[in-house]
C-alpha cells in the first residue's frame, strides 16, 4: 500500500511538472510572485522537484518547495522498499 502511494505521488510529480515550469517563467514579473505562492498550495505532489530549491532567490519558488516536502519522503520510502526487495531476492 505504501508503495502504491509512492508511485501515485511520483506520477503526480510528472503531471504537475509542466505547469510548475510554466508558472516559474512568470516569476520574472514581481506582480506574478504571489500567483506562484498560491499555485504551490494546490499541488502537493509537485514538491518532489527539489531542483527548484536551487532558485532560492525567487521568492515564489522558495515557498513552492516548502509547502510540498512530503512527496520527497514518499520517493525515499520507495527507494528503501526496492533495496529491501533486492536484498531478499539475493
UniProtKB/Swiss-Prot annotation:
Question: Could you say which protein family the record assigns here?
Answer: Belongs to the UPF0512 family.
The protein's name in its UniProt record: UPF0512 protein L
